[in-house]
């Protein structure tokens, strides 16, 4: 009224918006949405939720579970920005290179970092179907010396399952090395040789053949690590409380899928695979 602008006009069926009214209604809805966003952000700041988190993990975990978990988490908490730093080389959390880390290790480092366990990962030896057709799959520990072995480098060589495999072949040189677990999976798929892989990844891959039972002495455990001063930050707590059960459920689903895949493959091959002769000692 103060602008002498007519927003409604009367018709036979009642009042309706004028062209100016329709235009201003759209603008008013934008203002309402902006005000709602402003209020949500202000409340998020009050709760300590708004802000960013720098999370680091290796590529295979990022692709398998962490990225989907982040996507789901942000649908619930859009005010939290998560910067995912994907590298197979461990970043120094205590030096501030990242806020959180998801790492799979056999033993935790002696540090002031807080650790929360996620899941255990079993490893076994695998080769590709193509490699098995060309070279045969190793049937016993003693057979390993006669096969092409893929090694690790720059940290991957310290994975317990990798150490175990090369201990069985008296220092035989690998045909190639990789510093990435994700790339190691691809190298095995490509038929380059035999290597230890996480069962949760490899069992569900129809291109791979499992050569051994699980290497019981080489179980790795994934943890979320964080600096002690971040433990009471609401957005950090919320992410950890979401990520841990998400990854645990994902692991359970993938293991079941892998079990079904191996059973189906055995049925297709006409006989179950007997790994009893290739059972690494505990």
Each PLM stretch: what is its role?
Residues 51-111, 257-260, 264:
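Central regulatory/effector-binding core of bacterial HTH transcription factors
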Residues 76, 85-178, 201:
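Acidic, Gly/Pro-rich loop/turn segments at junctions of secondary structure
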Residues 26, 199, 204-207, 215-282:
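C-terminal effector-binding regulatory domain of bacterial HTH transcription factors
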Residues 1-17:
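A short LG(V/I)-centered, amphipathic sequence patch enriched
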Residues 54-56, 101, 150, 195, ...:
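Short, well-ordered beta-strand segments
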């Amino acid at each position: 009224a103060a602008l002498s602008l007519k927003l409604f006009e009367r018709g036979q069926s009642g009042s309706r918006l004028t062209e100016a009214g329709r235009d201003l209604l759209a603008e008013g809805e934008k203002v309402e949405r902006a005000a709602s966003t402003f209020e949500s952000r202000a409340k998020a700041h009050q709760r300590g939720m708004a802000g960013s988190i720098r999370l680091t993990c290796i590529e295979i975990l990022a692709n398998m579970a962490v990225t989907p978990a982040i996507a789901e988490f942000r649908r619930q908490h859009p005010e939290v920005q998560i910067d995912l730093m994907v590298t197979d080389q461990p970043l120094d959390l205590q030096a501030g290179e990242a806020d959180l880390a998801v790492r799979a290790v056999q033993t935790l480092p002696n540090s002031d970092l807080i650790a929360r366990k996620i899941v255990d990962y079993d490893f076994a030896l695998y080769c590709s179907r193509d490699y098995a057709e060309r070279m045969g799959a190793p049937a016993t520990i003693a057979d390993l010396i006669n096969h092409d072995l893929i090694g690790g480098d720059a940290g991957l060589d310290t994975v317990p399952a990798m150490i175990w495999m090369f201990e069985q072949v008296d220092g035989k040189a690998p045909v190639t090395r990789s510093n990435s677990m994700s790339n190691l999976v691809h190298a095995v798929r490509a038929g380059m040789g035999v290597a230890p892989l996480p069962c949760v990844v490899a069992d569900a891959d129809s291109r791979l053949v499992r050569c051994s039972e699980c290497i019981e002495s080489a179980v790795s455990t994934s943890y979320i690590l964080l600096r002690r001063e971040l433990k009471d930050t609401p957005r950090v707590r919320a992410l950890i409380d979401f990520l841990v059960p998400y990854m645990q459920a994902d692991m359970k689903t993938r293991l079941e899928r892998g079990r079904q895949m191996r059973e189906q493959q055995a049925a297709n091959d006409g006989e179950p695979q007997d790994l009893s002769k290739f059972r690494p000692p505990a």
